[in-house]
Amino acid sequence: MKKKYTVFLILAFISWKFISAQVVTIHVDASQGRKAISPYIYGKNNNISDDPGSPTTAAEWKLMREAGLRFTRENGGNNATKYNWRLKLSSHPDWYNNVYAHNWDYAAKMLSDSMPGVQGMWAFQLIGKAASNTSHNFNDYAYNGSTWWSGVCQNLAGGGVANAAGTCTATTNGNPNLYLENWTADSTVGILDHWFGTGGLNYNQNNIRYWSMDNEPDIWNSTHDDVMPAQPAAEAFMQLYFAAAKKARAKFPNIKLCGPVPA
């Protein structure tokens, strides 16, 4: 009897191996059950130069076209939070809070001219401050030849004193009132009139429908601690959000507001 069981088990094992070794062919008819998906599901971040003196190259435009790019986020991330569209300036929290030129008008025009139909996303500023001038930048070139080091996050614009030991704690913080100005909900949504309104630049709002509601507000007390040393309560931030959102939608009913954008 024991031999019979052994033979049975061997035959069963051989049969299982034979069955499991069979090739299974699955045919998929890709023409069936197809559903449209948004062309904006795929995108890239910060691709278009906003500096007329250093434009996006022909090779870069060619690469984006060949990749099938349909959506590009162009607000500059951390540098979006204090962008002043009137003066075309922004404060750089990852580089001493220094203020440098950025021209969103130029970037939006180049995107529209070079890749018609591609959606470009810019941003509204909700923190309440925007860059006002370049006169109070920390002289990073004189300090160390503009070399990156662990202290680039120190708040040195506005007359600060560098802490040579590094880290993000300056010996003396700069005065943000020297390089920033107040920036209300009316101020930030005014770019919609500038781009789309009567007497404005007459940009195609259908290709600039998506707007980021600032950038990473959950870490403002780190990236923008010059004006927000304590993290705002969620309710306080949402009131800033709602104030700008209502004014933006009143000017541009078909606008698509995105965010809050978390870190």
Positions of PLM-derived features:
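N-terminal catalytic cores of secreted or lumenal carbohydrate-active enzymes
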Residues: V23-A263
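Bacterial Sec-dependent N-terminal signal peptides
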Residues: M1-Q22
